Structure formats: structure tokens, C-alpha cells
Amino acid sequence: MTAVDVHYVVEGSPDGPPVLLSGSLGSDLRMWAPQVAALTTAGYRVVRYDQRGHGRSPVPPGPYSLADLGADVLALLDRLQIRRAHFVGLSLGGMVGMWVGQYAPHRLHTLTLCCTSAELGPPSGWADRAATVRAEGTGAVAEAAVQRWFTPQWRAAHPERTRDFQDMIASTPAEGYAACCAAIETMDLTARLPKISAPTLVVAGADDPATPPAHAQRIADAVPLARLEIIGPAAHLANVEQPGIVNDLILGHLKENS
Ligand SMILES: O=C(O)CC1=CCC(=O)O1
């Protein structure tokens, strides 16, 4: 597990409480654009970053593990001299958040886990997807991915934004995407969920076909200080489809636990 220096952007009050935003497979830090104004206006120092293998972060050869992705977060906090942060992660980002909550709990004030899962099988599905991407590129999986990310109604109402997200996925380096599929294929976060001590907000999209509400329920049942919110209409990228609801939930959680 060797950390890489991931690409990041910091916005908001330099002295505000830090909030780290960690994104999904196939995304880059632009996926959090709907959260930035709400968090910075409320006085937070917002740190967004690209997962390794994604966006403008380095692409070391895979496979990656969640320990690798978690080590990148700890190294980023060290680089920014942040002792503890509020961590908000969606999907793969939420998995990274659970890893940090389990193995480096002292680095977290709170955890917000959006549209994620502690166990997302079958493993063969991730191996198959990685093989497709290595053979044909990320463009081969981008259209199917946006169909999981957004409800049909949202896609119909926002064709340009849907295309932009599809382009974001298609521009993700194939090796980075495939190597992160391996991290999901091999992850095992369930047994240690009770070790997460951070106050945890779990948010699920009611219409999410990728990490459905039942997965969020399992996390909320196992994490001692967790609370579950199911919101809709929203598919996998609920932070984009329902930014107002998600922002209010995040801000409420941070304020309750500062
Ligand atoms: O399959 C998808 O695109 C949904 C997803 C699973 C993990 C992740 O980060 O995104």
C-alpha cells in the first residue's frame, strides 16, 4: 500500500472545518459541483480530489485495493495538514470513507456515506467489467453507467448534463477504472462496520439500481452511530439529482456533530 499524491482542489474558508469529498468510480472531482457553494457558504473548507486512476490523479498500474485508496486520503490529509476532517463519499468514495472510518478513525469528525455499499458483488461482475474496459476503453461502459447514475426522468430533462457525465466516465483512464473495479471486487468492509466510531449519515437514492437502499440499510444497521435517509426521486448520483436535499442533509449532519 503506497500512497500517491492525488489531484485536489480546495475551496472556501481557509480556517473553516475541513470537509473532504470523495467520488465514485468513473468520476472526477467535478461530480461534487452541486455541493461546493452550499458548503463554502456555510463556512467550510471544501477539499475535492480525484481518486487514483481518475481525473488528473496519477494512474499507477493496478489492481488497486481499498487500502490503497484509503492511504491516498490519509496522505492528502497529511499534505494539507488536516488532522481530522468531515468525510463525504459517494459509492466508491463511500467505500473509501468506510475504510478510513475502520482503519484510521482518529482522522474523521463525521462520515457521510452516499449511495454506497460495504459489499457489492458478485466479484466476477467487477472482473468482467475491468476486462471490458481494458480491452475496449471506458467509453464501452459509459452509456450503461449513466443509466445507473440518473433516473430516466432526470436524463430526459437534462440531456446535456447527462452527456457531460457520460464524457466524464469515457475520459477516465482505462487502467485507473479497471484497477478500481478490482478494489470493489476484493473489498470486505462488512465485518468491521461496528468499528466505525464517527457519527455517520447514510444516504440512499430510492431509485438507485447500483447500490440500492437495502445496502444502505445494512450499513446503517451495523454502524453504531448511524442514521439512514432514503431520498427520491434519485438514482446513483443522488447528490446531482437531488442537490438541495443532499446539501441540507450533509449540512445538518455536520452542524449536529461539530
Ligand atoms: O456501476 C456503477 O457505475 C456504480 C458504481 C459502483 C461503485 C461506484 O463507485 O459506482
PLM ranges: what are they?
Residues Q217-L237:
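Catalytic histidine neighborhood in serine/cysteine hydrolases
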Residues G89, G93, G97:
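Gly/Ala-rich beta-loop-alpha elbow adjacent to hydrolase catalytic centers
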Residues A234-P243, N247:
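Catalytic histidine-centered segment of alpha/beta-hydrolase-like enzymes
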Residues I196, V202-A204, D208:
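Short beta-strand/loop motif that positions the catalytic acidic residue
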Residues M98-Y103, R107-G137, A142:
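Flexible "cap/lid" loop of the alpha/beta hydrolase fold
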Residues H7-V59:
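Conserved HGGG/HGGXW glycine-rich cap/lid loop of the alpha/beta-hydrolase fold
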Residues D68-A85:
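Conserved acidic catalytic loop of the alpha/beta-hydrolase fold
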Residues G121-S124, E136-K195:
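Conserved alpha/beta-hydrolase catalytic His-Asp/Glu region
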